[in-house]
Amino acid sequence: MLRPSLLSLHEAPVIQPVPEHERVVLAVDLPALGLRAGDIGCVVHVHPGGAGYEVEFCTLTGETIAVASVIASQVRPVTAQEMPSARRLVG
């Protein structure tokens, strides 16, 4: 197995943490919570260094469906070129 050198670790791009209260898009399914990739949530807590987040997912009427602990790679910021859509909750 190849291991990255210390030099390559330092050359890796720095990803800026998403600040609290920003909207994010879920990048993976979280079936245990009934969440799907593409669901939109709000960051309610940023773990040290932006390694992970607590993200609240709500219905369009504001009812909280889940608060998920995710690592940074499981979410991404929303972009200006995206439009949300609605889906029926299962269960």
Residue ranges and their predicted role:
Residues 90-91:
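Extended, low-polarity transmembrane helix blocks
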